């Protein structure tokens, strides 16, 4: 199987061919996802909640992410694999380089960091050292204590303008991709159209270049409250493989997210 690269995703954006991505944490699910057609995966710090049982992602370490990155890479050797940089693992550009190197050695193709224009020095330093970066704006789970909870971001004009400014700054610093989480659909559309790099949405409407879901949400096995922007694809299909194929199809056809999964 030909490995998926960032060049493939840039081409999809140019051709307006939407793509589905998902979180993965082990070799078995990574292999299953790859066999159904998922070719971009994220080893997310969401594992702190989905696997470790915590209320936030803040307890996750670089060693945790590296361990699961190695497992996912073993199961999906051809996928484009993103790895989250955990809380405080990129507080300085130098620290970001040290920790990103560990994740790249574990099998990641790029690292994802949460934050706006303040991250530009780190993004620039990593890019110059051959570490591709995916930015993350909007709702940033590592900032839950600043936000006061998990809330939609960018609903007023000033906040929306700041998101666009941060997105352009990250792209200018060398970011190769961007995740937008829990922002109004029109804001996400504006940002996606303004950037040359692929934009992946989660709770950001259907006009981003790609979509991502936490696998536990997509399969309806998350405990507690299910966010309004997710869909349980397993409920209708009754089979994990069929559910993943439905997720891919619905994203590619623009059927997911639907209006009920979108913020205005």
Swiss-Prot record:
**EC top class, as a word:** transferase
Catalytic activity field: 3-methyl-2-oxobutanoate + (6R)-5,10-methylene-5,6,7,8-tetrahydrofolate + H2O = 2-dehydropantoate + (6S)-5,6,7,8-tetrahydrofolate
The cross-references to CDD domains, in alphabetical order and at most eight, read:
KPHMT-like (cd06557)
Q: Which co-factors does it depend on?
A: Mg(2+)
Q: InterPro entries, alphabetically?
A: Pantoate_hydroxy_MeTrfase, Pyrv/PenolPyrv_kinase-like_dom, Pyrv_kinase-like_dom_sf
Q: Where is the active site?
A: 181
**Pathway(s) it belongs to:** Cofactor biosynthesis; (R)-pantothenate biosynthesis; (R)-pantoate from 3-methyl-2-oxobutanoate: step 1/2
Provide the primary localization.
Answer: cytoplasm
Cell compartment(s), UniProt = Cytoplasm
Q: Does the keyword Zinc apply?
A: no
Q: Name one GO biological process term.
A: pantothenate biosynthetic process
For this protein, the Enzyme Commission number is 2.1.2.11
Which cellular components does GO assign to this protein?
Answer: cytoplasm
Where is Mg(2+) annotated to bind?
A: 45, 84, 114
Q: How are cofactors bound according to the entry's free-text note?
A: Binds 1 Mg(2+) ion per subunit.
Q: Does the keyword Cytoplasm apply?
A: yes
Binding residues for 3-methyl-2-oxobutanoate, per the UniProt record? 45-46, 84, 112
Q: Which molecular-function annotations from GO does this UniProt entry contain?
A: 3-methyl-2-oxobutanoate hydroxymethyltransferase activity; magnesium ion binding
Pfam families found in the cross-reference section:
Pantoate_transf
Keywords attached to this entry: Cytoplasm, Magnesium, Metal-binding, Pantothenate biosynthesis, Transferase
Q: Which family does it belong to?
A: Belongs to the PanB family.
Subunit text: Homodecamer; pentamer of dimers.
* Function per UniProt: Catalyzes the reversible reaction in which hydroxymethyl group from 5,10-methylenetetrahydrofolate is transferred onto alpha-ketoisovalerate to form ketopantoate.
The name this protein carries in UniProt is: 3-methyl-2-oxobutanoate hydroxymethyltransferase
Gene encoding the protein: panB
